[in-house]
From Swiss-Prot:
It catalyses: S-ubiquitinyl-[E2 ubiquitin-conjugating enzyme]-L-cysteine + [acceptor protein]-L-lysine = [E2 ubiquitin-conjugating enzyme]-L-cysteine + N(6)-ubiquitinyl-[acceptor protein]-L-lysine. Binds 1 divalent metal cation per subunit. Mg(2+) or Mn(2+). The gene is rag1. Coiled coil: none annotated. GO terms for cellular component: DNA recombinase complex; endodeoxyribonuclease complex; nucleus. It is found in: Nucleus. Homodimer. Component of the RAG complex composed of core components rag1 and rag2. It comes from the Eukaryota. A divalent metal cation binds at E69. This is V(D)J recombination-activating protein 1. One of its GO terms (biological process) is V(D)J recombination.
Length: 106
């Protein structure tokens, strides 16, 4: 963790940025059959915005916490919408709803 990553290790930020752009381009061109030339929002954020997050916060810890909070928010919403009497049925419903919500094939 660095307090000022742009001053203390700018070469690492630049290296990450260049590598992430190359990786995104590789996914887009070489795996068209799999991703239809598109990538998920989470992967886009990882590849495109992590250098900005590191510059701003000094690490990706805040970004990881943001992802956890977002996931918890989704599960709370699904749980509220799909509340059932039995805990096992409730969890099953939440997981199925989450799978349907996140599946790119459906």
């Amino acid at each position: 963790r660095s307090t000022f990553p742009t001053r203390e290790c700018p070469e690492l930020l630049c290296q990450y940025s260049c590598n992430s752009q190359r990786f995104a381009e590789l996914l887009r061109t070489e795996f068209k059959h799999r991703y239809e030339g598109k990538i998920t929002n989470y992967l886009h954020k990882t590849l495109a915005h992590v250098p900005e997050i590191i510059e701003r916060d000094g690490s990706i810890g805040a970004w990881a916490s943001e992802g956890n909070e977002s996931g918890n928010k989704l599960f709370r919403r699904f749980r509220k919408m799909n509340a059932r009497q039995s805990k096992s049925y409730e969890l099953e419903g939440i997981l199925k709803h989450h799978w349907l919500y996140t599946s790119k094939y459906l």
